[in-house]
C-alpha cells in the first residue's frame, strides 16, 4: 500500500505539534490544499474524555501521482518530525471536502458536530468545483485504461483483472480500489468485455491448433 500512487491525500495536523507559521509553510509547497476548521468538538469514545484531541484535517492535491509515503516525508520535512503520523489516499475529493466540516453523508449519519464551512482555509488556489470535475474526467480516463488492458491482455474475468492489477497496477496508475470505483455501475459492459476476451482467447487457441 505504501507504493500506491495517487494525487489526492488527507492527513491530520495537531496544533501542539506544528510551528506557528504552519499555514505559510504549507503554501511554499505550491500545491492546492483545503484545511478544515479546528476540530475541537469531536466527541471521544474514551471513557472520561469528552472530546478528541483538537486537530485539523488537510485535503492535499498533488501535481502528479505520488505515494502517500512521499507526501508524509515532505510534510514532516516542512513542519517537523512529529507534525503528522499517517497520510491516506482520498478516493473521492468531494466527499473528503464535505468531511472537513462533517457535512459528508457518513459524518451526518454518525451525527458528528458540524463545523462552519466559512472557516475552511484554501491554499494555492484550491477550487473544489475543479477537482469534482476532474474526478469525473479521471474516472472516464481510468475506465478507458481498464478497457484497453482487458483487450490487450485478453483478461477473461474479474479475477484475471485483479491479478493483473496486483502485479502491474503501479505502471498504469491503478489499484484494485480504483478499478472497483471506475467499473461500478458498468456490470453489463464489463460482461461484454470479458465475454469478448474469452471469445478472442478461444479463437486464438483454435488458430494455434490448425
From Swiss-Prot:
Coiled coil: none annotated. Signal peptide: none annotated. It holds the Pfam family Rep_OBD. It comes from the Bacteria. GO terms for cellular component: extrachromosomal circular DNA. Keywords: DNA replication, Plasmid. GO terms for biological process: DNA replication. GO terms for molecular function: DNA binding; DNA topoisomerase activity; identical protein binding. Belongs to the Gram-positive plasmids replication protein type 2 family. Is essential for plasmid replication. Nicks the positive strand at the plus origin of replication. This is Replication protein RepB. The gene is repB.
Amino acid at each position: 500500500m505504501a507504493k500506491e500512487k495517487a494525487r489526492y491525500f488527507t492527513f491530520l495536523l495537531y496544533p501542539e505539534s506544528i510551528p506557528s507559521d504552519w499555514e505559510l509553510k504549507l503554501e511554499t509547497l505550491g500545491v492546492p490544499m483545503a484545511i478544515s476548521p479546528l476540530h475541537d468538538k469531536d466527541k471521544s469514545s474514551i471513557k472520561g474524555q469528552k472530546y478528541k484531541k483538537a486537530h485539523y484535517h488537510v485535503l492535499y492535491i498533488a501535481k502528479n501521482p505520488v505515494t502517500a509515503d512521499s507526501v508524509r516525508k515532505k510534510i514532516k520535512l516542512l513542519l517537523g518530525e512529529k507534525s503528522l503520523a499517517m497520510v491516506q489516499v482520498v478516493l473521492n475529493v468531494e466527499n473528503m471536502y464535505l468531511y472537513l466540516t462533517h457535512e459528508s453523508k457518513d459524518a451526518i449519519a454518525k451525527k458528528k458536530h458540524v463545523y462552519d464551512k466559512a472557516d475552511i482555509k484554501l491554499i494555492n488556489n484550491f477550487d473544489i468545483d475543479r477537482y469534482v470535475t476532474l474526478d469525473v474526467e479521471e474516472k472516464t480516463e481510468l475506465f478507458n485504461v481498464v478497457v484497453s488492458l482487458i483487450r490487450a491482455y485478453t483478461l477473461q474475468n474479474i479475477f484475471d483483472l485483479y491479478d493483473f492489477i496486483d502485479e502491474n497496477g503501479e505502471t498504469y496508475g491503478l489499484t484494485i480500489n480504483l478499478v472497483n470505483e471506475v467499473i461500478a455501475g458498468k456490470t453489463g459492459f464489463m460482461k461484454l468485455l470479458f465475454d469478448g476476451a474469452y471469445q478472442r482467447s478461444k479463437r486464438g487457441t483454435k488458430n494455434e491448433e490448425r
